[in-house]
Amino acid sequence: MIKVRLQKDNDLMDILNIMAPGTPLRDGLENILRAKTGGLIVIGDSEEILDIVDGGFTIDAEYSPSYVYELAKMDGAIILSGDVKRIIRANAQLMPDPSVPTFETGTRHRTADRIAKQTGNIVIAISQRRNIITIYRNNIKYVLRDSSVILGKANQALQTLEKYVSVLDKVINNLNVLEFRDLVTLFDVMTAIQRTEMVMRIVWEMERYICELGNEARLISMQLNELVRYVEEDEILLIRDYCETYMDYTEVYDEIQSMSSEELINLDQISKILGYTGVPLVDTFISPRGYRMLHRIPRIPSNVIENVVKNFKELKAVMEASYEQLDKVEGIGEARAKAIKNGLRRLKEQANIDKNIVTR
């Protein structure tokens, strides 16, 4: 679903994917949790990891949840291969660099935190007394929760998402009408980007829940895909349509993702990121380049859309262009020229049908 979220988010998703309910690793962790033995598991057997291992014994056997459960009864750590297919060592003592800072309490969790920061590997600490599973990697710390708790939160987030998508639909419908009338203001654009990013942040939360739930999340995943199928793509295309020409739209998108919730509320702050400083949002009119609308026309390749925007600069000019003018653009023949003209006409008609211009 989410393709371009920030790297830290993606790292956490990767971790949750391999530990979702139903995976062999999660089954092993749950067995240890139920037995209340506690445990420390390191994923990865690189030289860097083996250099801080002292003692224990070599297993080098195929991974299975029952093997891990039995080995966790011993005090030492378990070392798994990076692909979690083999158990490399057991009952190992780990000697991380004591100068690596940690705010964890308890020997097991302090060791796990330090190793994760020192090596960048995934380290799992299973608490004997608190009965929780904590995952560490680099500076990430995440506590796995019971599926019933996550399912409740996921359903609640889904209800919130439905409300946000409803508001976003109205904002986008309004923007569509204004784009075809060439009456878009910076306020309209920044509101659309703000609302889209708000939706994407809830989607990311939902994706995290889905990763944690594993095969228990099929229904929620289907509902999520139905709700927000093209939302992230729309946000990127909005930025391409309206950011200043000298700016890299991917960097702009990264900056918007990095905004805090408080900053995201401020439309002037979003406007500044897109290259507009010290201008009144409501009174400043701006024309779209046309990326978003052209991408909505079926069977028009991305490279052709690039050529159209490069030639005509604005959506208004594309709409006013004749078949002959479109035909001259590289990659556009008579058939594509008709497809673009007819496609834009249909989109304009649809926008007028859907219009729900928000009174400001």
Curated annotation (Swiss-Prot):
Reaction catalysis annotation: 2 ATP = 3',3'-c-di-AMP + 2 diphosphate
E.C. no: 2.7.7.85
Record GO biological process: DNA repair
InterPro entries in UniProt: DisA, DisA_sf, DNA_integrity_DisA_N_sf, DNA_integrity_scan_DisA_link, DNA_integrity_scan_DisA_N, DNA_integrity_scanning_protein, HhH_motif, RuvA_2-like
Requisite cofactors: Mg(2+)
Keyword terms, alphabetized: ATP-binding, DNA damage, DNA repair, DNA-binding, Magnesium, Nucleotide-binding, Nucleotidyltransferase, Transferase
Domain named DAC: residues: 9-147
GO molecular function: adenylate cyclase activity; ATP binding; catalytic activity, acting on DNA; diadenylate cyclase activity; DNA binding; hydrolase activity
Gene3D superfamilies attached to this UniProt entry: 5' to 3' exonuclease, C-terminal subdomain (1.10.150.20), DNA integrity scanning linker region (1.20.1260.110), DNA integrity scanning protein, DisA, N-terminal domain (3.40.1700.10)
Residues engaged in binding ATP: G76, L94, T107, R108, H109, R110, T111
Domain of life: Bacteria
Family per record: Belongs to the DisA family.
Function: Participates in a DNA-damage check-point that is active prior to asymmetric division when DNA is damaged. DisA forms globular foci that rapidly scan along the chromosomes during sporulation, searching for lesions. When a lesion is present, DisA pauses at the lesion site. This triggers a cellular response that culminates in a temporary block in sporulation initiation.
Quaternary structure annotation from Swiss-Prot or TrEMBL: Homooctamer.
NCBIfam families reported in the protein's UniProt record: PRK13482.1
Protein name: DNA integrity scanning protein DisA
Native source organism of the sequence: Clostridium tetani (strain Massachusetts / E88)
